[in-house]
Amino acid sequence: MAAQRLAALHAAAPSAFSSTSSASHGRPAARSSTTALLPVALPRASATLRAAPSRLLPQEAKAAGSGRSVMCMASASASAASAAVASGAAELKAAREDIRELLKTTHCHPILVRLGWHDSGTYDKNIKEWPQRGGANGSLRFDVELKHGANAGLVNALKLVQPIKDKYPNISYADLFQLASATAIEEAGGPKIPMTYGRIDVTGPEQCPPEGKLPDAGPSAPADHLRKVFYRMGLDDKEIVVLSGAHTLGRSRPERSGWGKPETKYTKNGPGAPGGQSWTAEWLKFDNSYFKEIKEKRDQDLLVLPTDAALFEDPTFKVYAEKYAEDQEAFFKDYAGAHAKLSNLGAKFNPPEGFTLDG
């Protein structure tokens, strides 16, 4: 009886594999035979897959584990960097609101614009090393640089923004100076500046640039002087003219620069400390009136420096100056790009590409 059952099983076994045998000879397999294969083939394949990891050599297993660790570390590092940028952007946005409030109460737009400009305007494109190349690196906070002749009065700007720096200690001075400058332009009615942040500060006064890097108001050859200074920074004739348009804000004080009247009908009274001579009648409003006033030269109470007059005397400069006197929209557009470029000169960023505030 047992022999009969064994014979029956032996006879049935070939039918389970008959489809494979037939296919190997070019004959189509019966549908019922294909179905019969599935319960046999799939469990075997699954068992093979489950057993595969156990066949890794020790070195391979170690390498696989190391690779996963590196990936996890990279992911954690990227997450930390992203969180740091988000935190930095949040602090800068909060600081920007404080700057806006400061501007409302002190009307210090001109001196904050100057603060950002003079920190970045020391850049030398011919020097590659940071911070020797100068530029927007926060060095203007040190006394040795504040005492440069071109920076007369900027200690007052530092005093204005220092409480904001104390409130947000993670913001670099370099970022704070440029944030204050761009915000002052915007709050005075000027264009929105497409700013980048993440600038790194220098750490000591020994890293300050030498004196003499900034423009002089009354050189013997004004156009040549402007080109020498701005070309060193990597800026061109168009950018020289459009950036000069920021003189639509502010006044020149003779006790600081040696230029201008002690006071005029436009500066005797009004917001802020009285005195000085302004380039425009509404010297807290950012517009293209600077170019109009220089071109017309009709108001003796308004200031025109030799470097201002050069914009309409030099034939190349004049093309741009005439354009901006007629077209404020063009002035705003070109100014926004030039100001953003100036604010980045010489800067070293963390992260290297910097980051924006997105509104």
Curated annotation (Swiss-Prot):
Matching CDD domains: ascorbate_peroxidase
Presence of keyword Oxidoreductase: yes
Site (Transition state stabilizer): 114
Inducing or repressing factors: Induced by salt stress. Down-regulated by hydrogen peroxide in leaves.
Active-site positions on this chain: 118 (proton acceptor)
Tissue-level expression: Expressed in roots, leaves, stems and flowers.
Family: Belongs to the peroxidase family. Ascorbate peroxidase subfamily.
Name this protein carries in UniProt: Probable L-ascorbate peroxidase 7, chloroplastic
